[in-house]
């Protein structure tokens, strides 16, 4: 039906309204008859009715239309934008079907399939190999199938007593859920802490929480005051010699899709000290509490920021004593004021500080007398840089961590986050070498100057794309494993 048949169309435009997505479940009235999952379902429905915060117009430029829409939508004219580009880019994913093989060859990245990690032997039990030595997976260069195989083995293994895991985001078709359900059906104790407030994944997480509960898993829904953003899986087993553990702690979600698109790290270890502290994390969360003190893990909100500051102080002491001092940080964003103030103090003391920060960085490097010893780089390449690495110290006394936390106040003080120390010497050196490679990137990296501008690195002698280097290395290692 043409509703405009009696009118003359003088101009036309495509409109796109963006609504606020900021829903806080704790701000809404909680009905006593609802469980938290039911409450979240109601809250998500509210998102479609939230206030418009932006209007984009493609086509019509008429001022009166702009004024009319501003009044009707209750949105200021400064939040109305004219666009030359299409407002809906979903069609882009279908373009590859319209492009010839030759055009794809010249204009697209070469297909990349994550490889088997070089430290794993095909056909040998993943559990057995982790018990022999700590293992590190580097996504997307290594396949996530290794971790999924660990869950599959544990779900069937008679020695498995329990599997405990924190989940923030999952793929739409998650094999991880399949094996957690299988473990519960096989009589294992399965505890899943499912964060229902993961923005734009609330509905997916709600659906999976129902599937997990139906299979017999115990599902918890996070904490009232803190989002649970940590990536921890603790598998407890028992044989004739006693209790033993496999702990996995990573920087990224258990999402099989994004593990092929994001750079992330995942440590799998049989270290008892790490396992016992991971168990404390789960015990505290089960009681609606947070861990207050640790000896090995860094656990936000109570013992991550303060321990990081302590390690920065230690480097300051080394610098003041005339000894080599170093801090290397790789993360998504840096906004934590306390940590930034301490980094500035470290720079003044002579500590060399290298940072690879993809997104927000509120600390300006290279300011004379303040941040002379700080270098900031951002890498934006084929894959989304998402891993977090902390390095404190140099000359054989390095402390190295991988973590779920950026140095943002929301992460250090308002979320449950976990950073794990790397005790295996080979893995520690592997991470340091990876960090050095990122610092040497002069293709996809940009350096921030003292004015806050990002520029192409000066060193252009030999082009180095760090992501390309890592995936070529992964292919070569996989080839050697299979040969």
Please describe what each predicted stretch is.
Residues 352-356:
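Hydrophobic alpha/beta core scaffold segments
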Residues 1-327, 345, 349, 361-483:
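N-terminal localization/anchoring segments of enzymes in phospholipid and broader phosphate metabolism
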């Amino acid at each position: 039906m043409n509703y405009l048949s009696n009118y003359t169309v003088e101009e036309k435009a495509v409109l796109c309204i963006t609504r606020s997505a900021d829903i806080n479940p704790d701000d809404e009235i909680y009905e006593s008859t609802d469980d938290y999952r039911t409450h979240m379902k109601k809250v998500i429905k509210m998102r479609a009715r939230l206030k418009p915060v932006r209007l984009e117009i493609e086509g019509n430029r008429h001022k009166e239309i702009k004024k009319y829409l501003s009044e009707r939508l209750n949105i200021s004219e400064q939040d109305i934008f004219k666009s030359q580009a299409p407002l809906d880019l979903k069609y882009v994913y279908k373009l590859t079907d319209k492009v010839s093989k030759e055009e794809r060859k010249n204009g697209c990245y070469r297909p990349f399939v994550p490889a088997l990690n070089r430290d794993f032997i095909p056909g040998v039990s993943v559990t057995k190999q982790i018990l022999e030595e700590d293992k590190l997976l580097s996504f997307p260069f290594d396949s996530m199938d290794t971790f999924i195989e660990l869950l599959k083995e544990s779900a069937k293994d008679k020695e498995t007593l329990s599997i405990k895991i924190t989940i923030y985001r999952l793929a739409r078709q998650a094999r991880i859920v399949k094996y957690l359900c299988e473990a519960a059906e096989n009589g294992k104790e399965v505890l899943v802490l499912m964060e229902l407030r993961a923005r734009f994944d609330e509905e997916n997480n709600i659906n999976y929480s129902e599937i997990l509960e139906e299979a017999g898993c115990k599902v918890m829904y996070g904490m009232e005051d803190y989002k649970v953003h940590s990536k921890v899986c603790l598998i407890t087993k028992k044989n004739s010699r006693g209790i033993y553990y496999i702990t996995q702690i990573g920087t990224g979600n258990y999402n099989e899709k994004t593990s092929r698109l994001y750079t992330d790290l995942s440590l799998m270890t049989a270290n008892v000290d790490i396992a016992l502290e991971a168990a404390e994390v789960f015990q505290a969360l089960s009681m609606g509490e947070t861990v207050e003190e640790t000896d090995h893990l860094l656990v936000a909100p109570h013992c991550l920021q303060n321990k990081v500051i302590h390690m920065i102080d230690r480097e300051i002491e080394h610098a003041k004593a005339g000894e080599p001092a170093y801090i290397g940080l790789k993360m998504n964003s840096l906004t934590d004021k306390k940590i930034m103030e301490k980094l500035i103090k470290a720079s003044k003391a002579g500590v060399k500080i290298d940072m690879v920060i993809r997104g927000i960085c509120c600390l300006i490097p290279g300011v004379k007398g303040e941040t002379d010893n700080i270098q900031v780089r951002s890498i934006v390449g084929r894959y989304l840089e998402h891993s977090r690495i902390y390095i404190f110290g140099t000359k054989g006394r390095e402390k190295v961590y991988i973590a779920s936390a950026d140095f943002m106040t929301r992460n250090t003080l308002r979320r449950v986050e976990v950073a794990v120390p790397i005790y295996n010497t080979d893995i520690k050196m592997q991470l340091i070498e990876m960090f050095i490679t990122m610092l040497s990137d002069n293709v996809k990296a940009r350096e921030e100057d003292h004015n806050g501008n990002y520029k192409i690195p000066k060193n252009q002698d030999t082009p180095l794309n760090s992501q390309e280097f890592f995936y070529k290395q992964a292919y070569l290692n996989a080839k050697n494993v299979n040969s």
